[in-house]
Amino acid sequence: MRRTVKDFRNAKGQRLVYLTAYDYPTARLAEAAGVDAILVGDSLGMVVLGYPSTVPVTLEEMLHHTKAARRGAPETFLVADLPYLAYATLDRALLAAERLLKEGGADAVKLEGGEEVAEIVRGLVRAGVPVLGHVGLTPQTASQLGGYKLQGRRPEEAERILKGALALEEAGAYGVVLEMVPARLAKEVTERLSVHTVGIGAGPHTDAQVLVFHDVVGLYGDFKPRFVKRYLEAGRLIQEALSRYAQEVREGVFPGEEHSF
């Protein structure tokens, strides 16, 4: 049975599993594996669409992939990212969230930022939209943070992240993602918040963990961040299978009699 926002609000201290999925087959596999929540992240821009960052991802693209993921995982709680600038104002955020929830079938939306987006979060929650916050490394604005690197090393950075997480909770977010922050900071934030935290590159002390599907299964062999654990080398196995197929076609081995009518 699909979890509800209330379940996640009461999930503090539980070891929850989030996983990204961007289409019907990956969402179907994630649901079959029993994950607690699927995140249709704007990371799809990089791992599915080949963009250099998440910035070019549009609302229409997010909607397209959210619909597909929902069809693949009808019984799993599904969170969809609000893409870059889709929540620059509350009106824009409400329109984007409306489409992702009503048309896309998402159960909640995620947006990046701390204190600076707290009022947007408050307005969304007031309108009945469940919101997952996101602090630390925020990929949509990574260039302002010096690139894709660890955040919160310096005391002032750590304070900003903690204050941001607390502001998101106070605004009504049902949980907060902590990305690429020191484990000790993630532990402190997790202990200070009453809502659950979701870590990615944030150590073992968060309430939940999230990883990108393609990283977990090793679809891209040349990309492995330090915080990723690969459970399969799918990219290599798939490439080997496709090479064998091509070879057998060229050699006249496939199709054989057993593949013919």
Swiss-Prot record:
**PANTHER family (alphabetical):** 3-METHYL-2-OXOBUTANOATE HYDROXYMETHYLTRANSFERASE
Origin organism of this chain?
Thermus thermophilus (strain ATCC BAA-163 / DSM 7039 / HB27)
Q: Cellular location of this protein?
A: Cytoplasm
Chief subcellular location equals cytoplasm
Binding of 3-methyl-2-oxobutanoate, residues:
42-43, 81, 110
The record's cofactor note says: Binds 1 Mg(2+) ion per subunit.
Name of the protein in its database record: 3-methyl-2-oxobutanoate hydroxymethyltransferase
Which HAMAP family does the record associate with it?
A: PanB (MF_00156)
The EC number on file is: 2.1.2.11
Q: Which gene holds the coding sequence for this protein?
A: panB
Cofactor dependence? Mg(2+)
Query: Which GO terms label this protein's molecular function in UniProt?
Result: 3-methyl-2-oxobutanoate hydroxymethyltransferase activity; magnesium ion binding
